[in-house]
Regions:
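Generic hydrophobic/packing signal
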Residues: 104-106, 123, 127, 169
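Phosphate-coordination loops involved in phosphoryl transfer and adenosine-cofactor binding
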Residues: 96-99, 209-210
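A gly/proline- and charged-residue-enriched helix-loop-helix capping module
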Residues: 113-139
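DNA-contacting interfaces and partner/effector-binding or oligomerization modules
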Residues: 98-106, 110-112
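A structural signal for short, well-ordered beta-strand segments and their strand-loop junctions
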Residues: 101-103, 130-134, 164-166
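Class I S-adenosyl-L-methionine-dependent methyltransferase catalytic core
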Residues: 2-69, 75-82, 108-117, 140-393
Length: 393
């Protein structure tokens, strides 16, 4: 995962993350960063600010649900305010003819232009007269472009009735993730889990290398491939023999065809896990049980409720089976569908874990309302939300 500035830049008490999945990305960050997070703020939908104590940069490199990470180095009352502290820092990493950019999130066009002007003036006052300004489409330099254009990118967003700014210090290796989705023998479809989302879900499980993750609705194995890449032992189950074969081919491809005993994928029923596992408990379960049919138009609310109702029994029966098979300190991560209707309603499949001895996972100082919705999805009228359960102690 590329650090585009020295890791010491992140040795600060405030960092900002540009979110890939909205609140789900915040949940992932609170899980991965753990006790280093003392407070989290959501100044806008695209960016969250985390107050941290003694944050090892290696934790940042584990994140999948963030597009960028930047320390908060300047907070301005107005877009034309002095930003010497930021531009002085930038000048120490720039040479004349270096590329610079400003990525503005939920900032108006006039304020964005004023911020760009203030940034350039500050850099030039520091003695760099020939830096090149990249003007990104939509006022946001995408994370991959930060790397390909070798730009010193500044993240800016509304904060405390003013603006917060900081240099992008880290971006994820999005190209490698995308290749795992498109080059494997059985690529994921437009409506199935992306590798990035699958890795985010795996991170919510909070496992250490060598522990065991089970996906009881594994499909073509996207979650298992991402879990294996984190050195986890992988168990996969699917009721369709064709999908079991696809999952085996994909995970074998992901490790270069090497024969390995770190995974086991078999045909079976997710509602009978305890019998299948012969009473063995797994460290985590991460799964998307059923992908509803792709919709070509928003359904009526009554139709959406009927669709959810037909799937609810499978989900709840499977959750009961998962509860019997999870280790006492493990987690269960389940994706559920959210249907947007023509009347403007959202119909969500809800899960109840209390009677199964489960409670909702709440990391650190932030309280989450479940199911946690994904933002910025392109799946049109069927979207996703996520439950994370853990056994009651």
């Amino acid at each position: 995962m590329p650090f585009v500035l020295p890791t010491r830049v992140l040795e600060t008490d405030e960092i900002s993350l540009v979110l890939a999945f909205g609140k789900l990305s915040v949940l992932e960050a609170c899980t991965v960063l753990g006790r280093t997070v003392t407070q989290a703020e959501a100044p806008c939908e695209r960016v969250s600010v985390f107050h941290v104590a003694h944050l090892p940069p290696k934790y940042i490199a584990e994140l999948s649900g963030a597009h960028k990470c930047a320390p908060v180095t300047s907070v301005l009352d107005s877009p034309s305010a002095d930003m010497t502290s930021l531009t002085g820092f930038m000048a120490s990493y720039l040479e004349d003819k270096s590329n610079v950019s400003l990525s503005g999130y939920e900032i108006g066009e006039d304020d964005y232009e004023d911020l760009v002007r203030s940034m350039l003036n500050g850099i030039r006052e520091a003695g760099l007269k020939k830096v090149r300004l990249l003007r990104p489409e939509g006022n946001e330099l995408l994370s991959e472009r930060v790397l390909t254009r070798a730009a010193l990118d500044v993240v800016a967003f509304p904060y405390h009735e003013g603006f917060a700014l900081g240099p992008t210090a880290w971006v994820p290796d999005s190209a490698a993730m995308r290749q795992r989705g498109t080059r494997k023998p059985s690529p994921h479809s437009d409506i199935s889990l992306s590798p990035r989302l699958a890795r985010t879900l795996v991170n919510l499980a909070g496992l250490k290398p060598g522990q065991t993750l089970l996906d009881p609705f594994c499909g073509s194995g996207t979650i298992l491939v991402e879990a294996y890449a984190k050195s986890l032992r992988c168990l996969g189950v699917d009721s369709r023999a064709s999908r079991v074969q696809e999952a085996r081919e994909n995970i074998r491809w992901s490790i270069g065809g090497v024969t390995d005993r770190g995974y086991d994928i078999r045909k079976g029923d997710a509602r009978g896990l305890s019998r299948m596992l012969r009473g063995t408990k797994v460290d985590a379960i991460v799964t998307e049980p059923l992908l509803l049919p792709q919709l070509h138009a928003r359904p009526k609310t009554s139709t959406a409720r009927a669709m959810i109702g037909e799937s609810a029994k499978v989900y709840n029966d499977a959750l009961a089976s998962m509860a019997e098979s999870i280790h006492s300190e493990g987690r269960i991560v389940v994706v559920v569908p959210v249907i947007q209707t023509m009347e403007g309603d959202e119909v969500t499949l809800t899960l109840e874990g209390r009677k199964l001895g489960l409670r909702l996972y709440q990391p650190g100082p932030v309280g989450f309302e479940y199911p946690v919705r994904l933002s910025f999805e392109s799946t049109r009228w069927i979207r996703r939300a996520v439950y994370v359960f853990e056994p009651r102690s």
